[in-house]
UniProtKB/Swiss-Prot annotation:
Keywords: Aminopeptidase, Cytoplasm, Hydrolase, Manganese, Metal-binding, Protease
Membership in a protein family: Belongs to the peptidase M17 family.
Cofactor(s), names only, from the UniProt record: Mn(2+)
GO MF term set: manganese ion binding; metalloaminopeptidase activity
HAMAP family for this protein: Cytosol_peptidase_M17
EC number of the protein: 3.4.11.1, 3.4.11.10
UniProt lineage: Bacteria, Pseudomonadati, Pseudomonadota, Alphaproteobacteria, Rickettsiales
Note accompanying the cofactor annotation: Binds 2 manganese ions per subunit.
Annotated localization: Cytoplasm
Active site: residue positions: K277, R351
Binding site for Mn(2+) 1: D270, D347, E349
Protein name: Probable cytosol aminopeptidase
Species of origin: Rickettsia bellii (strain RML369-C)
Transmembrane regions listed in the UniProt entry: none
One GO location term (cellular component): cytoplasm
Length: 502
């Protein structure tokens, strides 16, 4: 993990110094002084607009002409229009800076910031820049045994001086705890499925959360059978690896305060079962447990901050595999709620896992609010692509709060429709419901949401986040490499902090 240190200006000792310049290309007195120290290098660079325009996100690394100094490079970072800067933009700028200096093989970087930028204090800006750099520093190369030394290069340290280092440190420490939740989510999601079996994954959850004073219970197939979880168990019955239900209870508020329940789909690998998927890109189905990973990452972020809230996380961990013992299309399963479901397609398995998991959370903890997170449908990818996750909810206020939280951390949500017509589409001729709609290719994400909605108890606020299009990416972003994004952790942490802290 990138080492970030807030220190006094005279203690800065770095190879590269970051310089913020907006699109007006005007230097304040501090930058004029720095420019003079470097023999006009900054002013000469910005005078040539072919080299640097101050556009937001533009990064220009220029070698220092002062041979005797410790600073070997100046890193010009474009702010664009200061009036248009947001927390998201500042944080992502930190990520862009980190990525550029990494490519330039610069081991240590520094930032001196004493003045406000737009409406943000120097300590606020510094904490956001550092947070973005930290998130962008993530790597998953543990299985790359033949990497060349040059490809293993990482930025070692980021030293920052502000007009209030104590405040900057305090702000960043919170960001760092959230990043640890994001990194766990990315790590476990990126792991190959032969490494993260349900048992191993469950043990990793317990190892990290029990150190944060979170009570963790791991239910095996015998316990789930006794509870009547026929839907979840049906999905996993074709696998040699036993299914697990992991229950994480964090009590940061008083015992009488209501719980928030976070429920995650944890299909460790999804072949589609007997309704077998095409082989093309099937390897990406290791990411079909990203909803569960987001729940665990959120629990880490919340518990490590010791937030004064009561939260329970429930994740169903299964493998959807074909075998002689696998669930068949046409099978009928009885859920923990007592309702029955006809399994018309074994590749619509995530909703079956969630049906029992959300019911368990409600029965045991009586939460005021249930939010489930799942890479549930390909239909949501068709609808929203890789930009938005779908948000379905029975409560307008809850949906609005989630969408607002998502906007604030750039984990976007788009409200999707629920309607009685969609609900009718999952009626079955022989059971209480079917696990797919009866109109082929129609409203697939909405019918899936309605399946889960049938397991939400009276009076419970509920939201379903379908993250199938945003959980992993085939290209890097400003805040991380390609692969697992860690989507949902920062969104849910922000939502909880804004709405449930006592």
């Amino acid at each position: 993990m990138l080492h970030v240190n807030f220190t006094e200006e005279e203690s800065l000792n770095t190879q590269a110094l970051i310089v913020f310049i907006d699109d007006k290309l005007k230097l304040d007195s501090e930058l004029i002084n720095l420019d003079q120290q470097h023999h006009g290098l900054i002013s000469k660079t910005i005078a040539n607009k072919l080299q640097f325009t101050g556009k937001y996100g533009q990064i220009k690394i220029i070698p220092s002409v002062v041979k005797s100094g410790e600073v070997k490079y100046l890193v010009l970072a474009g702010l664009g229009s200061e009036e248009k800067l947001t927390e998201v933009k500042i944080e992502e700028l930190g990520g862009k800076i980190l990525q550029n200096v990494t490519n330039a093989k610069i081991a240590t970087i520094g930032l001196k910031i004493k003045n406000r930028i737009s409406n943000f204090t120097s300590s606020h800006v510094a904490s956001l820049i550092a947070s973005g750099a930290l998130l962008a520093s993530y790597r998953f190369d543990k299985y790359r045994t033949t990497l060349k030394e040059a490809d293993k290069f990482v930025v070692e340290s980021f030293e920052i001086s502000t007009d209030n280092n104590a405040e900057a440190t305090k702000l960043f420490e919170v960001k760092k705890l959230i990043a640890e939740g994001v990194f766990f989510t990315r790590d476990i999601s990126n792991e190959p499925s032969n490494i993260k079996t349900p048992q191993i994954y469950a043990e990793r959850i317990a190892d990290i959360l029990e150190e944060l004073n979170v009570d963790v219970s791991i239910l095996g197939e015998r316990e789930m059978k006794n509870l009547g979880m026929g839907a979840l168990l049906g999905v996993g019955q074709g696998s040699q690896n036993e299914s697990k239900l992991v229950v994480m209870e964090y009590q940061g508020a008083n015992k009488d305060a209501p719980y928030i329940a976070l429920v995650g789909k944890g299909v460790i690998f999804d072949t589609g079962g007997i309704s077998l998927k095409p082989s093309n890109n099937m390897h990406l189905m290791r990411y079909d447990m990203c909803g569960s990973a987001a729940v665990v990452g959120t629990m880490i972020a919340v518990a490590s901050q010791e937030l004064p809230v009561n939260i329970v996380g429930v994740v169903g961990l299964v493998e959807n595999m074909p075998s002689g013992n696998a669930q068949r299309p046409g099978d009928v399963v009885t859920t923990m709620s007592g309702q029955t479901a006809e399994v018309l397609n074994t590749d619509a398995e995530g909703r079956l896992v969630l049906a029992d998991a959300v019911w368990y959370a409600q029965e045991k903890f009586k939460p005021k609010c249930v939010i489930d997170v799942a890479t549930l449908t390909g239909a949501i990818v068709v609808s929203l692509g890789p930009t938005y996750a779908g948000c379905f909810s029975n409560n307008d206020e809850l949906a609005d709060k989630l969408i607002k939280a998502g906007e604030e951390v750039n984990e976007k949500l788009w409200r999707m429709p629920l309607h009685e017509d969609y609900d009718a589409m999952i009626n079955s001729d022989i059971a209480d419901m079917a696990n797919i709609g009866n109109v082929p290719g129609a409203a697939g994400s909405s019918t899936a949401a309605h399946f889960i909605k049938r397991f939400i108890q009276e009076g419970v606020e509920w939201a379903h986040l379908d993250i199938a299009g945003v959980a992993n990416s085939n290209k890097p972003s400003s805040l991380g490499p390609k692969g697992a994004v860690g989507y949902g952790v920062r969104l849910l942490e922000k939502f909880i902090k804004e709405n449930y802290e006592q």
